Regions:
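Metal-dependent catalytic cores of enzymes that make or break cyclic nucleotides
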Residues: 2-311
Length: 311
């Protein structure tokens, strides 16, 4: 089966951005900006083409376990406490979950610990207490790109934002960030290029560096990818654990029973696994409201619109 893996993961990053925007007020296209900054830095370090593609995938999915983390931790803490915990980066759980989830994604190179250690500090004060020379370059790059985007794009695009980013990186060199990554960032980006994020032209440049093209994968790999996305969607709400996988399995079973050929059966499974991905853009207050949704109907209709956007 042919899949544009980069395009599919890019679409998933949009859905993840919706969750982060709801929870910690991060701007739209956060995942893509982190990916763009990361691959530009990867080019500076002369990473080969396959490694750049894998770096882009890891950057797009660096917070892939956010819904799982939220679902499990909300059972222990209030939403207010959880938001503060995420902003402070005082937990390593979403890194552990995220690293484990990536086992379902078909990488071309070794990306071990790219997600697990993407919140580590250069001086060893991060969640796992690993110093910069114990952390893969990919994780160090994503860490810097993630923080830069959060600081630089948490408000309007202004010159003072660039100054804020510069001062933050300089002040935390050899503390939060290793000097090599900081130097790479400053060699690549200027205030003018940083301001270009305003018009989203960076996205075109991202796909020029990491081309979107269809690749052929076996059914097991395609199923793993679909299950990966379904898991992210189902953790969005406490009412939908394994819901998408259940729909996928039943849709495939019905298709087989009605005489569909094997390829059509597989496509029905994929459709079932992804049928609720639009819910990622809907607030949990609406999804879990134990009452009629008359007032929320316009927002609920957006689920279909968001599904089409992701699709």
């Amino acid at each position: 089966m042919e899949i544009d893996i980069i395009g599919l993961i890019s679409a998933c990053s949009y859905a993840l951005d919706c969750i982060e925007a709801e929870l910690v007020n991060i701007k739209n296209k956060h995942g893509k900006r982190v990916a763009y900054i990361s691959v530009r830095m990867g080019q500076y370090f002369d990473l080969p083409e396959d490694a750049l593609q894998d770096l882009a995938i890891c950057a797009l999915l660096h917070d892939n376990a956010l819904t799982q983390y939220i679902s499990e931790e909300l059972q222990k803490h209030s939403a207010k406490d959880l938001t503060a915990d995420l902003v402070a980066n005082t937990t390593n759980l979403h890194c552990i979950y995220g690293e484990r989830n990536l086992a379902k994604i078909p990488f071309k190179t070794d990306v071990t610990n790219a997600i697990l250690y993407h919140h580590e500090h250069a001086d060893g004060t991060g969640p796992f207490h690993k110093k910069w020379d114990e952390v893969p370059l990919s994780a160090r790059i994503i860490h810097l790109a993630d923080v830069v985007d959060i600081i630089g794009h948490s408000g309007a695009f202004e010159t003072q934002r660039w100054d804020m980013v510069k001062q933050y990186l300089i002040r935390h060199t050899d503390k939060l960030f290793d000097a090599a990554c900081v130097d790479a960032f400053f060699h690549i980006f200027s205030d003018n290029e940083f301001a270009a994020f305003r018009d989203d032209s960076f996205e075109t440049k991202l796909w020029e560096i990491v081309p979107r093209e269809k690749q052929t994968f076996g059914w097991e790999t395609c199923k793993n990818i679909a299950d990966f996305f379904a898991q992210i969607v189902d953790y969005k709400s406490s009412f939908t654990s394994r819901h998408s996988i259940g729909v996928a399995e039943k849709a495939a079973a019905f298709a087989a029973y009605n005489g569909y050929d094997p390829t059509q059966v597989q496509k029905m499974y994929l459709a079932g696994a992804l049928h609720d991905i639009g819910k990622m853009a809907i607030d949990n207050d609406i999804l879990e409201k134990p009452d009629k949704l008359t007032d929320e109907l316009p927002a609920k209709k957006m689920e279909t619109t968001c599904w089409n956007t992701v699709y």
